[in-house]
Swiss-Prot record:
It comes from Homo sapiens (Human). GO terms for cellular component: apical plasma membrane; basal plasma membrane; cytoplasm; external side of plasma membrane; extracellular region; glomerular endothelium fenestra; intercellular bridge; lysosome. The chain crosses the membrane at residues 291-311. This is Hematopoietic progenitor cell antigen CD34. Glycans are attached at N36, N51, N55, N85, N107, N126, N142, N194, N249.
Amino acid sequence: MLVRRGARAGPRMPRGWTALCLLSLLPSGFMSLDNNGTATPELPTQGTFSNVSTNVSYQETTTPSTLGSTSLHPVSQHGNEATTNITETTVKFTSTSVITSVYGNTNSSVQSQTSVISTVFTTPANVSTPETTLKPSLSPGNVSDLSTTSTSLATSPTKPYTSSSPILSDIKAEIKCSGIREVKLTQGICLEQNKTSSCAEFKKDRGEGLARVLCGEEQADADAGAQVCSLLLAQSEVRPQCLLLVLANRTEISSKLQLMKKHQSDLKKLGILDFTEQDVASHQSYSQKTLIALVTSGALLAVLGITGYFLMNRRSWSPTGERLGEDPYYTENGGGQGYSSGPGTSPEAQGKASVNRGAQENGTGQATSRNGHSARQHVVADTEL
């Protein structure tokens, strides 16, 4: 029986002795045997401290490794918890690192160590949180390769938060109040108010809100400070509740009308009930003196026109005011009554008429005697006939 047991134990004995020989051949600096026969790695520890970046500063120590190589992990010197202050743009980040070591016993193998680092950041609402990525690389530990677990920490840079919405305080608007008679432009938008107020009062109370509605989107598209929004307001003389927004051209008027329709609820909060495109001239009132002057000028022009019309129709009048072809007898006898020789006329009247005709034919206008000779001598002309 003893021989059989020795024969059976014979093949097993070299395997046990081989394992003991291999363990005894290991360097004393890396491995040591305890009383139970379990191999325990002796881990050298080296501590170093360095600054990672210009804006982020924290302390670093090394994690022990069985091969003598060190890997950097952000831990503290005094315990498992560390507080790290990261200063960038006057914002403080609080980082807490906790290291948990897990040991596992395996037969004929080296204990593997795994470090888990958890980082907690406390940040304000408007500041972006830096992203922390843990990249573990795990490999089983055994006698042949003598490797341990290492964990690397990667931190992304912090970017400041930028809001895309336009800041209302950066809107630069200039509102001018002008008289309706001083405006040289012809087109505008009538802002119908819920109550009568002057241009100065509207500018003081609700001018900022109107500039926010009409100039907010324009300055959001343009660069900051590159353009100043200018608005020209004029008080209507015909309708006191209408405040005219005078614009340069029809293209600008159409764009403003579309913008007002889009923000109609905001305009109602400002007391603007309605808005329509109207002419500037229709809101100018004329004074009483102007009306009197216009009526007087029209009356004088009418009188002069009527007088000229009648003067042009009277062709018998010369420019000097004398009638053409007149003689004293024609005037005395009612305009040519002496020329007619009716049956009831006397012979003396017929004789006078013939005398007058003879005088007109001679062109002298002087009465001739009955014997054919005139009482006055004829004037001889200077030139020969």
